[in-house]
Structure formats: C-alpha cells, structure tokens
Amino acid sequence: MTVTYSSKVANATFFGFHRLLLKWRGSIYKLLYREFIVFAVLYTAISLVYRLLLTGVQKRYFEKLSIYCDRYAEQIPVTFVLGFYVTLVVNRWWNQFVNLPWPDRLMFLISSSVHGSDEHGRLLRRTLMRYVNLTSLLIFRSVSTAVYKRFPTMDHVVEAGFMTTDERKLFNHLKSPHLKYWVPFIWFGNLATKARNEGRIRDSVDLQSLMTEMNRYRSWCSLLFGYDWVGIPLVYTQVVTLAVYTFFFACLIGRQFLDPTKGYAGHDLDLYIPIFTLLQFFFYAGWLKVAEQLINPFGEDDDDFETNWCIDRNLQVSLLAVDEMHMSLPKMKKDIYWDDSAARPPYTLAAADYCIPSFLGSTVQMGLSGSDFPDEEWLWDYEKHGHRHSMIRRVKRFLSAHEHPSSPRRRSYRRQTSDSSMFLPRDDLSPARDLLDVPSRNPPRASPTWKKSCFPEGSPTLHFSMGELSTIRETSQTSTLQSLTPQSSVRTSPIKMPLVPEVLITAAEAPVPTSGGYHHDSATSILSSEFTGVQPSKTEQQQGPMGSILSPSEKETPPGGPSPQTVSASAEENIFNCEEDPGDTFLKRWSLPGFLGSSHTSLGNLSPDPMSSQPALLIDTETSSEISGINIVAGSRVSSDMLYLMENLDTKETDIIELNKETEESPK
C-alpha cells in the first residue's frame, strides 16, 4: 500500500509539489483530520464559554490563567523532542526496508548449480526455492498484520502451496516453544547436501556458495524478527506523545483571544479563528503522525510495506527462474556492433539534448602559461627565496631563540649504494672502549666540543675517507688468525677478544736531546699504543729515530728525564701530521698485515724537518713468527675507525661478523 509519486517529482518545476498537496491517499489530511477537528471544536467551545457564560470576575480569572498558560507553554521542548524521535523512526523504517528478504540471488545460484533436466532435477530446484519462500512467509506472517490476515493458520499456508501435507506434519511434530521460521533452513541445507552427494551439485564450491547465500537470506529474516521484537523504548514514545499533546492542551487556553479593552500585552485584536495556532497544531501533530505511521511499516497504513505483494512476486519469479528458465538460452547471434569498435546507440529526437561528450576531468580546459613551468634551477631558486610561511609560523620564528643562517645552503642529495659504514664508521676519533663495542650502522656524529678537545689548535684534521685509503687486499683467515698466549708481565683482558692480526702503533719522533729517557705526555699518549704483548723482533728494535719502539713496561713507567711540559709546542701540534713518501702516490702509507702473517704498525708524529707541510703517518709491517693474536694492554685513545677496520680485516661486505670463541694454547 505504498504511495508512489516519483514520476510527479522527476523534474523540479515551478510549484512542483503543489500537485502532491491535493492527494488524499497517504496524505497528512487523511491521518490528521480527526485530531484537527477535535482540537478546533475544543478551542471553539472554550472561546464560547469565555465570551458568553463567564461573569466579570470569572473572566478576569480566566484571563490570568490564559496569560499564564501562554507564557509557560513555550517551555515544553516540542521541536527538540519531535526532531530526534522522528529521525530515529525514519532510520529504523529504512533499515527494515533494506533488509527485506529477496530470493533473487538464491534463485540464480540454484538455477546454475543444481543440474539435471529430468523430473528429479526439476523437483530438486523447485523444492529448494519453495523452502526459501516458506521461510520468508513464516517471518512475514509473524511480523505483518496484513500477511497474518491472509494466512491466519498453517492450513492456509498448505493450501497456498508453500508447504505440503507431509511437511506440515513434520513441522507440527517439532515441539518448540519458539518461532519455528528456521525449520525450512534446515530442510534446505539437508536437501542441498543430498543433491551434492547425488552429483546434482557437481562442485563443493557451488554448495558452499548456496549455503553462504542461504545464511544471508536467514540473516535478513532474523533481522526483521528482531526489529519486530525490540522496538523503540516505550518511555521515549510516551515522552514525545505527552509533550505534544500537553503543549496543545495548554494552547487551548493560552491561545484564546482576550478582551482588548483590558490592555493585555499581545491581545490587541479580538479574532475568532486562531489561524497560526491551528497551523502549529497541524505541523506538530502531523510530525507526530509521521512517526506513528513509520514506527511499524508492516501494518496496514497507506505507506506500509507491501508484504503480500512481496510474497507473491518472490514465489512466482523464483519458480520461473529455476524451472522454465533452467538452461533455457536464446540463440546466439552477432550483435549490430560486431564490426564497430565504437558502439553508439541511437538517440531519438526527444532525447537529442542528452547526447553529450565524455567527461575528461575538470582540469582539461585549464591552460598554463610558459612562466608557470619551472626550469632546471627551480629547487635552488625555491630555497634561495624561501617559503611563504603563514603568519603563525612567522610569529613562532620571531619568538624563537634559534638563529637561522643568513644565506640558505644548497641541499645535497645522495643515493646510498652500500652499507660502507659497516666497515668504516663515519664518526671521528673516539675513545677506544673494547673490541666488543662494535659501532652501529649509523653512529652519531661527534660533538664539536669533543673535536676541539681532541685536536690541538692549529693541528690538521685526519681525514679517514674512502678516497684517501690505499688498496686493501683480502687474505684468508687462517693466515692471519692464530693463537697467542699473552706475556706474564701484561695484564690479560677479562673479555675474550676476537682473533685479529697484531697491530703495533709507535711514534716517529724527531731527535731531541734527552738525558736518557723518553718524553711521555698525555697529549702524545696515542703515539705509544701497543696492541700486543709480543716482544718486538730484532728488525723492530733496530729502527732509527723515526720509528722508536716502547715496550709495555716503558709505557706504564716512563723513564726519568724532562717532564712532559718540556715537549715543544710544535711537536704537539704536529702529532697527527703525515710524512709524505716520495716513492708513494698516496699521502699516507698503509701496509696491512693480513698478507704478511703479522703486523707491526708505527705512527710518526714529529717530523725532523720543520718545513715539511705533511709529516708522516707511518704504519709499518714487520714479520714475526710469534705474532698471531691481539690483546689490549694500554687504554690509550685510538681511532675507532682504524681499530674496527683491523678487527674485521677478513670480513667481506656481505659477511656476518662473528666472535671466534675458540682459543688455542701456544708455548709461552
């Protein structure tokens, strides 16, 4: 019984809705005319009593009562209460329509999945669809008054063809105090499984699709049952109803026209018909009637759902789809656009105005001038001139204590080709902690204050870049890693260290006359750092003044002589200067001991020639048959870059560094 007027409002015209105001079926006039007549009669009766039956004193008292009712009737929040209530009811009404059970998807699946053109196959398909329609009928019969009037008993259901006599006996035999709308679902599932076992449903995927769609259909039916069971709370409906009718009961007295000779505010005119009061009643009471009509769409109102039509339509269409249309196909022919790649159906003369070109986007017609295209230096110009910051950002920048550089720096972009920091960390000289302290892949940069404390003023900075290193040749691990028993005079480290080649760093100093001792200073402590406890070989002991060697005992107890303060400032400033070898093309000479069997490294810091601009950084290698391990005996400050490179000499770029826990005893 739904009132359809979509065709009348298809186009927005001048007074387009005026034709709808004259309809009676489903209109507000049909719903409200009784209440409206009652309100008008009561208002007229009270007005006649005031004007004709009351005495002077009684009129004065009524007038005070009327002013009081008119003043405080507006305190009732009718608009607020009605607005929320009607919104809730309309949403609930539309959700119930969306969840009406439609068997179209199931009939498509049954027609294509249950095979067999014989009588048994036809019986299977029709029975499955009859169970589907029986389920919706049982739900509609329990929630809709119109459907219940059509099928008041189960005999009427059997008579209508939705259920056979045997099925009715089985249905009635099931003793359940609950609504048994779910019984046809069980029958559907059992019959579909039987059809799968018989081969009528050839694939388990098709059976699963049928069950999934049937579960969705069951969800629709159960949702309708839930809407019928749990409605809008009664207290809300009562509040809305009382608010509306109490307001208009107060209006019956408060909106009366009083004697204008008494000079009451707002009562200058004496009219007999309260036009705006009647309109207010029409709107508010009509608003409430909308909620009353939509709160249960399965009734018999003009705008309720056509459930009986749904039952008839679903049964007729579903049986037609699974029976007569099963494997019924029209003959295939070539369409009229067979040789035309751009199919374009014709337009009639009445629809010629709707033939429009395709929409390609809103920016198709937008053009840009040549000045809008950026050149190659657009990024540099953008950074040079700066952003256009908002006012808030400018205020923050003004209040900030951070000083921005006067000229912007050009940003440099670089692609990282390999994880070179795994072997050469990018940090500057850092205090050597222990060999297990492996630098991270992205070590933090050293602070400027630390750099200033490590390097004397005016001394050149060492550059450990990849371009300044000589070629590093890979050697086998067995040729360099051997066992070594530390000397008894040297305190062994409690931490087991990885076996790496021996590295000895000594200082090449200028011939300074001394009284039989070596000048040891904290600033030059790095010059006398020895990484092994092995006694130096003869070739090592025969080095000239450019390669003097200190034993561990000499490091711990420097001999007597001039104090460390007597060392010249020039010697301290040239600690890390490098001596240039005329026969070498590199600024520094690096000779790694992996391919010699052992290593003996000396670091030269003082150049005898004061005019040399780059004193030597000497790393010499000597052969020693006893050397095969490493042990830290001095806590001097050593470059972590150099230390980490020497520890992982045999490690390739894709290897995983492991700590060798095996130790071999060697003769002391």
Curated annotation (Swiss-Prot):
Subcellular location(s): the record lists: Cell membrane
Q: Does the keyword Transmembrane apply?
A: yes
Q: Where is the composition biased (Polar residues)?
A: 532-545
State the annotated membrane topology for this chain: Multi-pass membrane protein
Q: Could you tell me which residue ranges are on the Extracellular side of the membrane?
A: 52-60, 256-274
Kindly state which reaction or reactions the protein catalyses: chloride(in) = chloride(out)
GO BP annotations, alphabetical order: negative regulation of monoatomic ion transport
What tissue expression does the UniProt record report for this protein?
A: Present in skeletal muscle and weakly in brain, spinal cord, bone marrow and retina.
Molecular-function annotations in GO: intracellularly calcium-gated chloride channel activity; ligand-gated monoatomic anion channel activity; metal ion binding
> Compositional bias of type Low complexity: which residue ranges?
475-489
Q: Which PANTHER family match?
A: BESTROPHIN, BESTROPHIN-3
Please state which protein family the record places this protein in.
Belongs to the anion channel-forming bestrophin (TC 1.A.46) family. Calcium-sensitive chloride channel subfamily.
Protein name in the entry = Bestrophin-3
Query: Which species is this UniProt entry from?
Result: Homo sapiens (Human)
Encoded by which gene?
BEST3
